[in-house]
Amino acid sequence: MAPVDVESQVELDLKIEDFDYKNVALIKRFMTPVGRVLSRRATGLSAKKQRKMAKEVRKMKFLALVPYCDRHK
């Protein structure tokens, strides 16, 4: 099993209210550079927090706060 990076260990004490589509900097920590959502194993979040975070990512993409993909080639 791959080790969880140190940054995600710090995020475990977040409340579910902290995940908000307007908090782009926080949500982008749980996304790959390509724009995909990281897995629970990589983020270290609970199932409930992971679902909330994924929902907020979808909102951000719909509102064009983050792109759907990194680049079109």
Curated annotation (Swiss-Prot):
InterPro entries: Ribosomal_bS18 (IPR001648), Ribosomal_bS18_sf (IPR036870)
Keywords: Ribonucleoprotein, Ribosomal protein, RNA-binding, rRNA-binding
Pfam families per the UniProt record, alphabetical: Ribosomal_S18 (PF01084)
GO cellular component: ribonucleoprotein complex; ribosome
GO function terms (MF aspect): small ribosomal subunit rRNA binding; structural constituent of ribosome
GO term, biological process aspect, one: translation
NCBIfam families: S18
Function: Binds as a heterodimer with protein bS6 to the central domain of the 16S rRNA, where it helps stabilize the platform of the 30S subunit.
Similarity annotation: Belongs to the bacterial ribosomal protein bS18 family.
Assembly and binders: Part of the 30S ribosomal subunit. Forms a tight heterodimer with protein bS6.
Protein name, as recorded: Small ribosomal subunit protein bS18
Organism encoding this protein: Neorickettsia sennetsu (strain ATCC VR-367 / Miyayama) (Ehrlichia sennetsu)
